[in-house]
């Protein structure tokens, strides 16, 4: 009976949708979705920091962080559900798929912009100048000196955004006087005297910064956002694959067969009855030896006979009277038989 229960349990546990396989798939899906959620938060944080670092450079790729984060959040909820698990995981896979596409696009845009449009050589050479924000009095002086009349209404609205004139020596020994707004890092080496054609293809001014060191931070943030988007791209593909394999699994408990086998032997009325071995062992009388000790003491009763191979006379069919048991001889000794669980009577001489 115990062997049959063990075999039935092992056959049930070998099913692909058993409880052990379900828990293992659930644990793996939760691990990958939590990891994707952490990466999504990093993408969102770094992307927002890169986007808000300057006013004229807004290419930080934080959109994949929002989409991947929402998809991974749905995946965590769906992995812990039983009834609506499939619907939640399908929605999670859809959002993660869109997030993977957005991460691919933002990784290309941020990487190309950081490599092609930001030149750090003038910054490292200290050839870029930071222009602080001008006060209202200085702005009025600049505007009045430039217009030589009372400032108009449009000019008065832009007092706090008044620009300063910065002299930048050009390659042809000429001087350019660009007008630069306050809180701006300006690089003369990247400015082409007002022409739209840039020398090295990089930005020559970065508006609304606290110092020129913010440009170096912006460069590092863009490359960090690019790397995180690439990580989110591959991790999103892996997460979608894991959730796709888990959405169709249901927990199934192993069914135990508790039927008890009949231990009593079946008796057939048309066949010879079989006697159990233990019955014959306990109830059959013990086998006696052919001769007892008393027989060997009175060996004269049985005369010796020559071997059968040395006798030339034919043996008679009927035994001789000398070989019969004498009536005056005592009976053969047979010890009394007691069952194994019965106590023998006390000894009496």
From Swiss-Prot:
GO CC list: membrane
Major location category of this protein: membrane
Pfam families to which the protein is assigned, alphabetical: FAM70
Transmembrane helix among keywords: yes
Superkingdom of the organism of origin: Eukaryota
Biased composition (Low complexity): 316-329
Stated family: Belongs to the TMEM255 family.
PANTHER family, alphabetized: TRANSMEMBRANE PROTEIN 255A, TRANSMEMBRANE PROTEIN 255B-LIKE
The protein's name in its UniProt record: Transmembrane protein 255A
Organism in which the protein naturally occurs: Homo sapiens
Lineage: Eukaryota, Metazoa, Chordata, Craniata, Vertebrata
């Amino acid at each position: 009976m115990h062997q049959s229960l063990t075999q039935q349990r092992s056959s049930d546990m070998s099913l692909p949708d058993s409880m052990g396989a379900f828990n293992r798939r659930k644990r793996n899906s939760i691990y990958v979705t939590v990891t994707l959620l952490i990466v999504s938060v990093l993408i969102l944080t770094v992307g927002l920091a890169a986007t808000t670092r300057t006013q004229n450079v807004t290419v930080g790729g934080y959109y994949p962080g929002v989409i991947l984060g929402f998809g991974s959040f749905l995946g965590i909820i769906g992995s812990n559900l039983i009834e609506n698990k499939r619907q939640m995981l399908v929605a999670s896979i859809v959002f993660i798929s869109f997030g993977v596409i957005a991460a691919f696009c933002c990784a290309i845009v941020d990487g190309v912009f950081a490599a092609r449009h930001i030149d750090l050589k003038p910054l490292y050479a200290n050839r870029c100048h930071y222009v602080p924000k001008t006060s209202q009095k200085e702005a009025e002086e600049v505007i009045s000196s430039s217009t030589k009349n009372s400032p108009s209404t449009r000019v008065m609205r832009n007092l706090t955004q008044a620009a300063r004139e910065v002299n930048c020596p050009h390659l042809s020994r000429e001087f350019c006087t660009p007008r630069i707004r306050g809180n701006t890092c300006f690089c003369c080496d990247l400015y082409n005297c007002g022409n739209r054609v840039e020398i090295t293809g990089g930005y020559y001014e970065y508006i609304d910064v606290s110092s020129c060191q913010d440009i170096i931070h912006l460069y590092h943030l863009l490359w960090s956002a690019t790397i995180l988007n690439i990580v989110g791209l591959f991790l999103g593909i892996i997460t979608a694959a894991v959730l796709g394999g888990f959405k169709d699994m249901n927990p199934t408990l192993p069914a135990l067969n508790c039927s008890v086998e009949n231990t009593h032997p079946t008796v057939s009325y048309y066949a010879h009855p079989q006697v159990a071995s233990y019955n014959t062992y306990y109830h059959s009388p013990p086998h006696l030896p052919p001769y007892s000790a008393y027989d060997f003491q009175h060996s004269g009763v049985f005369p010796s006979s020559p071997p059968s191979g040395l006798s030339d006379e034919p043996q008679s069919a009927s035994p001789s009277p000398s070989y019969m048991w004498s009536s005056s001889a005592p009976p053969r000794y047979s010890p009394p038989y007691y069952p194994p669980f019965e106590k023998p009577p006390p000894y009496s001489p």
